[in-house]
Structure formats: structure tokens, C-alpha cells
Amino acid sequence: MSSERSVPSSDTEAPPQLSQVSETAPSGVFPVVAVGAGDVQTLEQFFSAMAPGEDLGFLVVPAATPSSSLPSAEDLASSLRAVAPLPVCTAAKAGKLVPNKIVVVPPAERLEAIDPSLALTLIPSERPANVDAGFRALAHALGPMAIGVLLAGEGTNGALGLAEIRRLGGLAAVQSLQEWGAGTVPDAALTTSPVDIVLPLAELAQHVRSYGRKLAPYPASLSSDAMAAIARISRAVHGHTRQDFAIYRPECLLPAARRRRLLLGHESLDEYAEHVEQEAKEAFLLQRDLQAGPRQFFRM
């Protein structure tokens, strides 16, 4: 399910750089799946595989390209209503993200920001990087509760935004290159940064739903059991990679560890810690994720 292109090796013990993530999610937050695509039919296929009542929010960020045009937000919403088992509306009418609803950003507007109440700020835009902007806004609003999905499209629109979602602890998923090939958005995403899921369209929606159902907002503080599990994971990564994460606060290790745990299907951090202890490859993959972004918090 996950895309792991290579396992890095390391002989250095230099302290790693950790990605900056939120330690807790905003009160009452729920997972939101942001979908970028430049093809209406692909969006229809993806959303036809969704299901109601799973408490996920959905954000559609269309990607126009020089060789293709997209319908208006109203027409796109109408097309999705015909196939999706969820209510669909435009961002102008919705105003904010809510669970169990698909919100469509107009192709001629850019999602500039999402505030703590998940209200949307849109501005007119003729720039081609609207998917990047929308993904970044979601990443900074929700952190580990954000899920980014890149589907069919040309060029690189969305690749940088997807990397930002992952850097801040969220999930990055792309449609299989076998369905679209080189020079497409999925290809750009895979060459920009690591991604977590690479699957054909028919399977992608199912795996995104499964991951989203398992997500829950972080507690205000970690339990003693969670702290102990994170310490085990840190020691295991150090043992396999020789990089020491013990100098960092456990809250800073949690997003990457939780994402890997959920992707692999482990029921608890303890179970995942045992897996990292036994599997050197997993330790290197987690090390890579922990190093994915700039600076973070040391123990005080």
C-alpha cells in the first residue's frame, strides 16, 4: 500500500532536524480529505467510492491546465452530486468545512487560509498553483488531521502542497503512475517528496477512508503509556540508524510514528514499537519521516 522507494543509510550520529507539527488539533476537529485533480471523470470515480457517516470532511481543489478546462464550481458540484453518496456544495455556499460534506473550491479562486473554526478564505486567482495553495492551507489548519490526495492532471500543481501536508504530520496519497505515466501530477508528487500511499484509483478511495476513520485528535497531553511507547520507538530507531531522537520531546515524534502505525495497521503504539524494534527497514523509514522538515523542539 505505501510507496517506499528506497531505504536510506546513515553512519552519522548528528542530531536530526524534525518537522514542525502541531502537538494538538483544534477542539472538535475532524479529518479532512483534500483532493486535487484536473479531470472531472477521475473526481467522479473517486467520490463514488466514498460512504456517508464516516465523519470525514472533503475539499475538492480543481487544477486547470493549459490543455484542459474545468467546469464552474456549480457545474462540478452538480456532477459530483450525481455519483457521490454525500452532500456536495461550493465553497462560497458552504463557508466552512463540516463532516460528511464535499466542498468544491471554484477553479478561478485560491483557498488562501482556513481558520480554527474551519471557515474558508478564498481570493480570486489566475495562478496555476491553486492546488498547492489549498493543500498548504489545510496542512497549516489541521496538521496531522489533514489527508492530501492527488489524482489525474498535468504538470506539477499540487506536488509542493502535498509535501507540506506530509511535513506537518498529515497523510500524502497519489494515484498510481501506471494509470497516468510520466509528466503528470502523480509523477511530480513522487519526485518532490516521499508519499505514503500510491494506488490505482479503484483502491485509493478505500484506503483513504480506512485511514481517516482511524484518526482522532491528539489529547492535550500524552499518557504515560504513550510516552513509554515513544521512548521505545526512539531507542529502536537509534539502535538501527545510529541517530538519537531522545533529545526531542515525545510530542514531536508522535505524528510520524502515528502515521506509520496507522498505515501498517498496528492497533497501538506499543505494537508499532515492537515492529520498529524488529524491522530495521521500518526504523529507517521512520527516521526519514522525522527528518522531513526543518527544526523542532528540544526537551527542556
Where are the regions that the model predicts?
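Conserved acid/base catalytic micro-environments in cytosolic active-site loops
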Residues: S2-F297
